[in-house]
Amino acid sequence: MQNQRNEYSISLRNLSYIILTISTGIVIHRKFRRIKDIEDLSSRFFRGQQKSLTKLNSLYGYVTSVGDGDNFRFYHTPGGRLLGWHWLRKVPSNRNALKNETLSIRLSGIDAPESGYFGKLGQPFSLEAKQFLARKLEHRSVRVYPLHRDQYNRAVCGVTYYPIRWLFFKRDIGPQLVSRGLAVVYEGANSSYYPTEKSVLMKIQETARKRKLGMHSLGNKLELPKDYKKRNK
């Protein structure tokens, strides 16, 4: 009888270990699964499915390229250097290897001058905005906070970057563009603001306008990016 009890206890213990191992594996897989594209982002990641902006889900990763003054391509590196990224595991550097492996990120809360496409001239300061964003983010690690998905299948995100590489101090990139007159506060449909609130961004924009920085130096000739897009549809 005693032997049967011992065998039963061992079986229960082994079963508990198996359940714990499987549960841990599932949690680790969900926590550190690499998000390859917008289709991999489940609805729980986005702001609309979350109760508090103070507890937004976020992704840590690497900016592979900057496309415009307010968007870039993002390669998710879950766990960062702690899980070997950039020293044991490398982020691909050529276009073919990156195909279908990155998310298109649109900065939330701001609107940068439109670059020229398909033979159309870009807006004034579009090149400066793109160059500034590239200087701050390109080939560097950032943290993105998905807010919603736009009509172009981009993840609209709050984005923080690390002014000093590998340190924990972070800054919101949006206000950096607005303060230099390289972007304006976005007030279109589905506008979202994070981590800097709209009221703060508006104050920063007003200061840039008074100082006639960047786009604001154009005075009455300033055409907002949203108006430029409507005119060139």
UniProtKB/Swiss-Prot annotation:
Compartments, record wording: Mitochondrion; Membrane
Protein residues bound to Ca(2+): D111
GO cellular component, as recorded: membrane; mitochondrion
A Gene Ontology molecular function term of the record: metal ion binding
Active site: R106, E114, R154
Keywords: Calcium, Endonuclease, Hydrolase, Membrane, Metal-binding, Mitochondrion, Nuclease, Transmembrane, Transmembrane helix
Family: Belongs to the LCL3 family.
Name of the featured protein: Probable endonuclease lcl3
The organism of origin for this protein: Schizosaccharomyces japonicus (strain yFS275 / FY16936)
Higher taxonomy: Eukaryota, Fungi, Dikarya, Ascomycota, Taphrinomycotina
Gene (UniProt): lcl3
